[in-house]
Protein backbone atom coordinates (compact mmCIF):
# COMPACT_ATOMS: atom_id res chain seq x y z
CA UNK A 1 0.00 0.00 0.00
CA UNK A 2 1.47 3.42 -0.92
CA UNK A 3 2.25 5.97 1.75
CA UNK A 4 -0.17 8.87 2.04
CA UNK A 5 1.18 12.37 1.39
CA UNK A 6 -0.65 15.45 2.71
CA UNK A 7 0.02 19.19 2.47
CA UNK A 8 -0.53 21.64 5.28
CA UNK A 9 0.71 24.63 7.26
CA UNK A 10 2.99 24.42 10.29
CA UNK A 11 1.07 25.78 13.31
CA UNK A 12 3.41 24.63 16.10
CA UNK A 13 7.19 24.22 16.38
CA UNK A 14 7.82 24.31 20.13
CA UNK A 15 8.64 20.60 20.51
CA UNK A 16 12.09 19.17 19.84
CA UNK A 17 12.24 17.48 16.39
CA UNK A 18 8.46 17.78 16.00
CA UNK A 19 6.14 20.19 14.20
CA UNK A 20 2.35 20.37 14.30
CA UNK A 21 0.87 20.59 10.80
CA UNK A 22 -2.73 21.68 10.08
CA UNK A 23 -4.13 19.92 7.02
CA UNK A 24 -7.29 21.41 5.52
CA UNK A 25 -9.77 19.49 3.39
CA UNK A 26 -12.73 20.85 1.43
CA UNK A 27 -15.88 19.00 0.45
CA UNK A 28 -19.42 19.71 -0.67
CA UNK A 29 -22.00 19.49 2.12
CA UNK A 30 -24.41 16.67 1.20
CA UNK A 31 -27.58 18.65 1.93
CA UNK A 32 -26.62 22.29 1.39
CA UNK A 33 -24.25 21.72 -1.57
CA UNK A 34 -21.98 24.34 -0.06
CA UNK A 35 -18.20 23.99 0.12
CA UNK A 36 -17.20 23.24 3.71
CA UNK A 37 -13.68 23.45 5.16
CA UNK A 38 -12.50 21.03 7.83
CA UNK A 39 -9.01 20.80 9.27
CA UNK A 40 -7.06 18.30 11.31
CA UNK A 41 -3.71 18.62 13.10
CA UNK A 42 -0.93 16.06 12.69
CA UNK A 43 2.35 15.82 14.59
CA UNK A 44 5.20 15.30 12.14
CA UNK A 45 8.89 14.47 12.60
CA UNK A 46 11.30 17.31 11.78
CA UNK A 47 14.81 15.89 12.26
CA UNK A 48 16.73 19.18 11.97
CA UNK A 49 14.18 21.60 13.49
CA UNK A 50 14.24 23.57 10.22
CA UNK A 51 10.52 24.29 9.72
CA UNK A 52 8.89 27.29 11.40
CA UNK A 53 5.31 28.45 12.00
CA UNK A 54 3.67 29.53 8.75
CA UNK A 55 5.69 27.27 6.44
CA UNK A 56 3.70 25.18 3.96
CA UNK A 57 5.00 21.60 4.03
CA UNK A 58 4.30 18.12 2.67
CA UNK A 59 4.11 15.28 5.19
CA UNK A 60 4.38 11.56 4.50
CA UNK A 61 2.99 8.65 6.48
CA UNK A 62 5.62 6.52 8.24
CA UNK A 63 6.02 3.91 10.96
CA UNK A 64 5.08 5.14 14.47
CA UNK A 65 7.83 7.30 15.98
CA UNK A 66 6.01 8.01 19.26
CA UNK A 67 2.51 7.76 20.72
CA UNK A 68 1.10 10.55 18.52
CA UNK A 69 3.71 10.91 15.76
CA UNK A 70 3.17 8.86 12.58
CA UNK A 71 4.15 11.40 9.91
CA UNK A 72 7.44 12.88 8.72
CA UNK A 73 8.06 16.17 6.88
CA UNK A 74 9.43 15.53 3.39
CA UNK A 75 9.47 18.97 1.71
CA UNK A 76 8.58 22.63 2.10
CA UNK A 77 6.55 24.51 -0.53
CA UNK A 78 7.31 27.97 0.83
CA UNK A 79 5.83 30.45 3.25
From Swiss-Prot:
UniProt KW keywords: Ribonucleoprotein, Ribosomal protein, RNA-binding, rRNA-binding
Domain of life per record: Bacteria
Gene Ontology MF terms in the entry: rRNA binding; structural constituent of ribosome
Pfam families assigned to the protein according to its UniProt record, in alphabetical order: Ribosomal_S17
One of the protein's GO biological processes: translation
One GO CC term, this protein: cytosolic small ribosomal subunit
Subunit structure: Part of the 30S ribosomal subunit.
Entries under NCBIfam families matching the protein: PRK05610.1, uS17_bact
Protein task: One of the primary rRNA binding proteins, it binds specifically to the 5'-end of 16S ribosomal RNA.
Protein name: Small ribosomal subunit protein uS17
Organism: Rhizobium etli (strain CIAT 652)
